[in-house]
From Swiss-Prot:
Pfam families: ABC_tran. It comes from Clostridium perfringens (strain SM101 / Type A). It is found in: Cell membrane. SUPFAM superfamilies: P-loop containing nucleoside triphosphate hydrolases (SSF52540). The keyword Oxidoreductase does not apply. ATP-binding (A) component of a common energy-coupling factor (ECF) ABC-transporter complex. Unlike classic ABC transporters this ECF transporter provides the energy necessary to transport a number of different substrates. GO terms for cellular component: ATP-binding cassette (ABC) transporter complex. This is Energy-coupling factor transporter ATP-binding protein EcfA2. Residues 6-242 form the ABC transporter domain. It is a peripheral membrane protein. NCBIfam families: cbiO, PRK13636.1.
């Protein structure tokens, strides 16, 4: 039996200006895995995330966290936000304390934890995100990538079960993208945290994500593992997305260069294995 940490049932959300942002969303998020939400700008990804965290309340439908409907009382929402943390696309919207240590400690202080527990959690979060050496530095002096790590540490200090990240790789150089995604997968594997990301960086999805949902105009139109989702090439392109670069290369090799592949590989490792197998078969024949 599948273990889902979040269940979304017929979720609708309307903004006060009449915009129908989410339209009958049904979605199950598997516990302890990395899930990507894909879609163009304005399809409702950020609205969905804010519903997950209780920042917004559904117009209709419901969200279950740990098999219980979200409690929208003040106490219930405070408890929910300890368990489901959000890291926004722009960390400057999330960092407001004078120093890194103060900013990271904010959530733990708000939980009214004992001082020694706060220190322990902050030290662990700083170490986990690789920013121990920055703890006394003013937040406004940090690079964009360092600010991202501080924002993640500020959520980690509350020891959440779910970590939601809106465009975690936006604004980062290629090395920064790799480092931040490896950090997230490390947290998922070692701490058991469920990771949910929204991203336009298609190439990271087959490398780091277990599950994928594709949204269009407030609806989920595709879901599955990366291979299942990107196999629907025409649907992907119709919603202004693309295949991962390796997947596109394999598509060209198959359709234009006579290579015979059973599946569309999406990563360098998968492609090398398939091409070597194809090459050996040709030479042996």
């Amino acid at each position: 039996m599948e273990d889902y940490i979040l269940k979304v049932e017929e979720l609708n959300y309307n903004y006060s200006d009449g915009t129908h942002a989410l339209k009958g969303i049904n979605m199950n998020i598997k516990r302890g895995e990395v899930t990507a939400i894909l879609g163009g700008n304005g399809v409702g990804k950020s609205t969905l995330f804010q519903n997950f965290n209780g920042i917004l309340k559904p117009s209709s439908g419901r969200i279950l966290f740990d098999n219980k409907p979200i409690d929208y009382s003040r106490k219930g929402i405070m408890k929910l936000r300890e368990s489901i943390g959000i890291v926004f696309q722009d960390p400057d919207n999330q960092l407001f304390s004078a120093s890194v240590y103060q900013d990271v400690s904010f959530g733990a202080v708000n939980m009214k934890l004992p001082e020694d527990e706060i220190r322990k959690r902050v030290d662990n979060a700083l170490k986990r995100t690789g920013i121990e050496h920055l703890k006394n530095k003013p937040t406004h002096c940090l690079s964009f990538g360092q600010k991202k790590r501080v924002a993640i540490a500020g959520v980690l200090v509350m020891e959440p079960k779910v970590l939601i990240l809106d465009e975690p790789t936006a604004g980062l150089d290629p090395m920064g993208v790799s480092e931040i995604m490896k950090l997230l997968v490390e947290m998922q594997k070692e701490l058991g945290i469920t990771i949910i990301i929204a991203t336009h960086d298609i190439d990271i999805v087959p490398l780091y994500c277990d599950n994928v949902f594709v949204m269009k105009e407030g609806r989920v139109i595709l879901q599955g593992n990366p291979k299942e989702v990107f196999a629907e090439k025409e649907v992907i392109r119709k919603v202004n997305l693309r295949l991962p670069r390796i997947g596109h290369l394999m598509e060209i090799l198959k359709e234009k260069d006579g290579f015979v592949f059973d599946e569309l590989d999406l990563t360098i490792g998968q492609a090398r294995k398939t091409i070597n197998s194809w090459k050996n078969k040709i030479f042996n024949d």
